[in-house]
UniProtKB/Swiss-Prot annotation:
Name of the coding gene: azoR
Any one Gene Ontology molecular-function term assigned to this protein's record: oxidoreductase activity, acting on NAD(P)H, quinone or similar compound as acceptor
Keywords for this protein: Flavoprotein, FMN, NAD, Oxidoreductase
Lineage summary: Bacteria, Bacillati, Mycoplasmatota, Mycoplasmoidales, Mycoplasmoidaceae
Family to which the UniProt record says this protein belongs: Belongs to the azoreductase type 1 family.
Cofactor field: FMN
Function: Quinone reductase that provides resistance to thiol-specific stress caused by electrophilic quinones.
A Pfam family the protein falls into: Flavodoxin_2
Designated name of the protein: FMN-dependent NADH:quinone oxidoreductase
Record InterPro entries: Flavodoxin_fold, Flavoprotein-like_sf, FMN-dep_NADH:Q_OxRdtase_AzoR1, NADH:quinone_OxRdtase_FMN_depd
Keyword Flavoprotein among UniProt keywords: yes
Length: 197
């Protein structure tokens, strides 16, 4: 049975743009994929999303329960769907903490300093979808493209199938619309991504 992991980094418990995008994605995806096991990782609740790498925990940060467990799950999963709203010009800190736990040399990528030549990603099995939102129009802060950053990270780890849906400009263009109305404007794009997954 295919396993799809939902990585929830939204700081809003429910009803956010990214949660509503996920609802639409799953509605479409499940129509053609009835025998899929969905695994929910809410990074707001799991230690892997709460614990940041620092001098106090450097010696045990990459423990089995907070690192290898998740790496092993990613290596056997069909794909992951990441909820990534922009927070302070980047994805949420919980997602950064998760990335720090799972992007580990010789586990999710071969480090160029260990293997002669370029680094080699080890998550080649994985398909990735990012469902994202941001208040500013895309491009207002060229240095703050959190979706592009995630694409680069997962590409480095060997992922070749990466798709995203970004609702940008939520604080200006869509400020007078309710969230579901806005998500409905992106329904066609979400359906395309779900059908390609």
């Amino acid at each position: 049975m295919k396993k799809v992991i939902i990585v929830d980094a939204s700081v809003t418990p429910s009803g956010s743009y990214t949660h509503l995008l996920l609802d639409r994605f799953l509605q479409t995806y499940k129509k053609q994929n009835s025998s899929v096991e969905f695994i929910d990782w809410n990074l707001n609740e799991l230690p892997v999303g709460k614990i940041s790498y620092n001098t106090q925990n450097a010696s045990n940060f990459f423990s089995f329960e907070n690192s290898d467990y998740y790496i092993d799950a990613l290596k056997t999963a069909y794909g992951i769907v990441i909820l990534a709203p922009m927070t302070n010009f980047n994805y949420p800190a919980s997602l950064k903490n998760f990335i720090d736990h799972v992007f580990v040399a010789n586990k999710t990528f071969q480090d160029k300093y260990v293997t002669k030549g370029a680094s080699k990603g080890l998550l080649t099995n994985l398909k990735v979808v990012v469902l994202a939102s941001q208040g500013a129009p895309l491009g207002w802060y060229p240095w703050a493209d959190h979706v592009s950053n995630l694409k680069g990270l997962f590409g480095f780890a060997g992922v070749t199938h990466f798709e995203s849906v970004l609702i940008d400009d939520t604080k200006i263009l869509y400020k007078d619309k309710n969230k579901q109305e806005v998500v409905d404007l992106f329904a066609h794009k979400v359906d395309q991504v779900a059908n390609n997954f």
